[in-house]
Each structure stands twice: as structure tokens, then as C-alpha cells.
Amino acid sequence: MKSARKTAASIVTIVVAALSFGCGDPIPVREMSLARMEITRAESVRADKYAPAELGEARKLLLGTHELIKGDELEKAKQGALDSFAKAREAYEKSLPLLARDTMEIAEKSLGEADEANADMLARDEFEKAQAAFKTAGDSFESKKYYEAYQAALEADKLAKSARNSALGKRAVLKEAIAEVDSVIAEAVKLNARTHSPEKLKTAEESNRAAS
């Protein structure tokens, strides 16, 4: 966060300098802005976790351009900005497939938990959508479309978690209903239902066991 503020302050200073020197001076404002945007792009795919060395170098190079401009070393400043951009792009490309893979693993775990909660029966629509999104993530990853894989995995994880929560809520309601039926069956047994209505009692017991 501090480095981002320093970089922003540096760019503001450089823009002011560019205006004061006039339009003809080759101060690399555009190159520096592109480098800053590429660093932000790398940060968006967790390059701080997956490519910390590359991201750190990109930030360092960009910050260094400020001193170069103050020293009137404009060509070196431009090259520093270009190098910063390249290093940030490297950080992005290194991080994205790793982020996609890890997000797919999280989604797979969420799908497993949804399955354990019987979401395939109690929240079928969301569960099937989660499965479809996870398949899309896998297909995209195999095709090296890592950003699409990452986005699909995020969607699969969200849907799987929602399906699990819906299923758990319905299971609680179902459990209460089963308990009520058990109570009714127990009362019927006391009233000799096994003697008077054995088939009906058997059907009720089997249905309740199936719902359990």
C-alpha cells in the first residue's frame, strides 16, 4: 500500500515536470503509466503470493524511474519503465495459472461438502450449476485459458457453497418433519396399528426411513 502511494506520488511529480519542460521533452509518462497498470493487473491475480520476486522487482524499477528523471537521465528512465512493465507482465503470467489452480481446488472442496449435505437432491439446481461451472473451469484450464478457468472456478465455488447452505437448511426442516412422523407412528403402534392396519403402518415406516 505504501509503495503504491509512493509510486502514485512519483508519477504526479513526473507529470508536473513534463508539463513544465514542455511537450517536446521525452519524459516517459506513458511508459510509466503502462507499467503502473501492469503492476496493478499482476496484483489482481495475487502476484504478491505467487510471484513476489517479480512483482517486487517491477515496483522497484518503476520507483527508480523517478530518481532517473530528477537526474535528467530520461532514456534510462524510459528503459526502467519498460523493464518494470516487462517484469510486471512476467509476474502476472506466472501467477495466473497458479491462482486458477488453487481456486479450482477450493471449488472442488466446496462441491464435495455440498454433496455430503445431499445438495444433489435438496438443492439440485444450484448444485448442477456448480458442477457445470467447475467443468468449464477444468476445460478452460486444460486449454490454457487461465483467466476464464479462474472466473469459472470462482463461480463454481460460490454456487457450491450456496447449494450446501440451502441443502443444510432443508435438511433441518426435513429432520423436524421426520421426527413428527416418527411420533405419529409411535402413537399408532400404541393403538394397535400393527394389528388393525399393518400394511399402512409398514408403508409409513418405510417412507420415513427412506426420507431419513
Predicted segments, located by residue:
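Sec-dependent bacterial lipoprotein signal peptides
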Residues: 1-21
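Long, charged/polar, soluble alpha-helical segments
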Residues: 2-4, 21-212
